[in-house]
């Protein structure tokens, strides 16, 4: 049996190809430097070990060559990439409290309907931050813990586990862009 492959060029991006203005957003300077990495870590009030991991990951990123697999990235100018953009809102646990412009983005992508229909919980990331987090009662009653990574990092119960496990499945030494992730990650669950 032959399997059909969907080529990246064949994907209709029109659903996802839209932008909003950046009013009300906090944005760091472009580039991937030790100062930017330190600023991300400071904004998140991370423990020293996380800053150390970020800086070590940046060293690995700068040392590794660009990959030769996949599409050409010759035109990729890392000095023009902004790695941290924070919407002007705190994390919400009630969908109705999420600002309308952010809510409209997720509505357009179908996220709220997917949550209501299929998921036990969802965390919605908008640019660099988790802006919405909700766990259905049935999952939490079963003892399932679902948290944003930054929230867990500040919880004395979970921080040691994150310290032990963070980036062990795909370590920064795996490849250049795993190292980039280790240096400038933000948000997630």
Regions found by a protein language model. Name each.
Residues 2-189:
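Glycine-rich and polybasic anion-binding loops at the starts of cofactor/ligand-binding domains
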């Amino acid at each position: 049996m032959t399997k059909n492959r969907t080529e990246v060029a064949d994907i209709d991006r029109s659903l996802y190809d839209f932008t909003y203005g950046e009013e009300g957003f906090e944005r760091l300077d472009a580039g991937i430097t030790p100062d930017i990495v330190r600023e991300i870590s400071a904004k998140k009030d991370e423990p020293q070990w996380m800053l150390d991991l970020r800086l070590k990951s940046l060293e690995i990123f700068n040392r590794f060559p660009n990959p030769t697999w996949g599409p050409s990235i010759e035109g990729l100018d890392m000095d023009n990439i902004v790695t941290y953009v924070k919407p002007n809102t705190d994390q919400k646990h009630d969908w109705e409290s999420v600002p309308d412009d952010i809510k409209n983005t997720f509505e357009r992508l179908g996220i709220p309907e997917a949550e209501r229909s299929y998921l036990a919980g969802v965390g919605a990331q908008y640019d660099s931050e988790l802006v919405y987090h909700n766990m259905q009662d049935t999952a939490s009653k079963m003892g399932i813990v679902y948290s944003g990574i930054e929230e867990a990092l500040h919880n004395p119960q979970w921080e040691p586990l994150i310290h032990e496990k963070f980036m062990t499945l795909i370590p920064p030494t795996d490849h250049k862009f795993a190292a980039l992730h280790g240096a400038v990650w933000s948000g997630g669950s």
